[in-house]
Regions:
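Function-determining surface determinants
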Residues: 1-505
């Protein structure tokens, strides 16, 4: 065992009797803390804390964070915590700064915890080594796990090594990563991946690959349904929609893989699944941009924004109720059964003329074609180009990105990473251009959809929204002016060569 601060685990309970009374010439002192307390294991749905090698626990009114280094830090948190950004300033908030502000914490396991501290004392009663033990018993599954955090006290390496060896002799193992805690304390533990890697075999056909991609993202969409219904955070609906959008891209871009009739049926089917989610997502985006909107306008116009966001919040509540009802409806259940029969049953989609093409051959052809289309549109854009063509460039870039990601495992990881990175830079500018455009249209519709009488509230809303539209328009123009420069950067000789090498046949 390593002679430094380290976390260990043991499958089962550990009592003070198992330690005995001494280690060599040093006395073992057992300090039992208060009676058992309730614990909660916290993480976001995307398990960003686990993926960082950490474990976040709530014991009574204290947050405890186990770091990959073996260090343990704590922070008082008297109230239940949803978002890390809402936590008061302190060591845990700082350590978890990587957690997305859009992701809410969830209780992924809970139960009771017994705590005790084991200290090694010399004949002068000085502590030479210490271990904090926490025994967790899950309330969901019949399992118990004990974590031991061995604290290295400077100047006493021998005592530390002795206590480390004692833990080893008792059956403790070094906790290399937090997965063991998740596996032991969570019923039906599984790892969520919003962008799962899809392995494509050397002999796989275009048809096999299309079906595999659709099956994969269907599972991602279905994994997010409960979070949409429970309204845990806005990312559940976002990931649900992105998954369906990727499926629709497969159906649209994989021409010839499915029969014309089947392709048309699939387009309608997935369009119908997507449609009911649109308005709620729009409202989520507006509410997430709330702070930005207030920053853009002087305080004299903030009252109108307050009124507007109250209306958005009320509409969002109505939209969420409607979508929840839809998710639980017989009609959606019927739609999903139809989809599952096609992609998980014995009656797969009808194949088209290109279905039997080798996946690699098909991939290079469709990616190269999409890349050339992106270049053709972008090279024709200047200051007089209509906005619709700039929007079309954004759509084609997104299609190109999806295609490259779908087939990424067929190509060198480093080369694909370089291509995607250069494409992202262009997409970011196009995305901002689109966001400002969409927001202007939405705000105009918001005003036009209401017959505003000359009340104080309606006048304030009209003034604020009018000013906001003007500012967003200016920002859109700025981003539009960057598009040509960003494309020139994307369309450099190195990127052209990379695309030709990877995809031109």
């Amino acid at each position: 065992m390593k002679s430094n601060s380290q976390n260990y685990f043991y499958s089962g309970p550990v009592t003070s009797k198992k330690f005995g009374k001494a280690l060599g010439k040093l006395t073992l002192k057992i300090d039992k803390k208060a009676e058992q307390v309730e614990f909660e294991l916290l993480d976001c749905f995307n398990q960003s804390i686990r993926k960082a090698g950490c474990v976040l626990l709530r014991l009574h009114n204290t947050l405890t964070l186990l770091l990959p280094s073996g260090q343990i830090i704590t922070q008082i948190c008297p109230e239940p915590l949803s978002y890390i950004t809402l936590l008061s300033e302190g060591p845990i908030k700082k350590a978890l700064s990587y957690v997305s502000p859009l992701r809410s914490l969830m209780v992924v396991s809970k139960g009771v915890c017994k705590q005790l501290t084991v200290s090694l004392l010399d004949n002068e009663q000085k502590t030479q080594s210490r271990a904090h033990l926490r025994t967790f018993t899950s309330s969901a599954i019949p399992t118990t796990l004990t974590l031991a955090s061995l604290v290295y006290l400077r100047g006493y390496p021998n005592a530390h090594e002795s206590l480390s060896k004692k833990l080893d002799d008792m059956g403790f193992n070094i906790m290399e990563n937090p997965n063991v805690i998740y596996e032991k304390l969570i019923a039906d533990y599984s790892v969520y991946e919003p962008k799962p890697k899809i392995t494509i075999g050397n002999n796989a056909t275009a048809y096999d690959t299309a079906n595999s991609i659709i099956r994969t993202y269907l599972k991602v969409a279905q994994a997010n349904e409960f979070g949409v219904i429970a309204d845990i955070d806005s990312e559940f609906l976002h990931d649900y929609r992105v998954s369906l959008r990727k499926i629709r891209s497969v159906i649209s871009l994989f021409k010839g893989v499915y029969s014309a009739e089947q392709r048309s049926t699939l387009k309608t089917l997935f369009s119908d699944l997507m449609a009911p989610t649109g308005r709620l997502r729009d409202l989520d985006v507006y509410l997430l941009e709330r702070e930005m909107y207030f920053t853009l306008l002087p305080t004299s116009l903030h009252q109108g924004l307050e009124y507007m966001f109250k209306l958005f919040e009320a509409e969002r509540n109505d939209q969420h109720k409607a979508l929840t009802k839809h998710f639980k409806s017989a009609s959606l259940n019927k739609q999903m059964r139809t989809v599952e029969k096609l992609f998980f049953g014995d009656n797969p989609p009808k194949a088209g003329a290109s279905a039997t093409m080798n996946a690699s051959e098909y991939a290079t052809g469709v990616i190269w074609k999409c890349y050339r289309k992106v270049c053709a549109i972008a090279r024709g854009i200047d200051e007089n180009t209509p906005d619709d063509e700039v929007h079309e460039l954004r759509i084609q870039c997104k299609k190109l990105r999806y295609l490259i990601e779908f087939f990424s495992t067929l190509f060198d990881k480093k080369d694909i990473g370089t291509v995607i990175k250069s494409l992202k830079v262009l997409q970011n500018t196009l995305g901002l251009f689109n966001d400002y455009s969409v927001q202007q249209d939405a705000l105009k519709e918001f005003i036009d959809a209401r017959t505003l009488s000359n009340t104080k509230q309606n006048i304030a809303i009209a003034q604020s929204v009018g000013a906001l539209i003007a500012i967003l328009h200016q920002r859109q123009l700025v981003e539009r002016s960057k598009v040509v420069a960003k494309f020139v950067n994307f369309d450099n000789a190195d990127t052209q060569t990379k695309f030709k090498t990877l995809f031109k046949r």
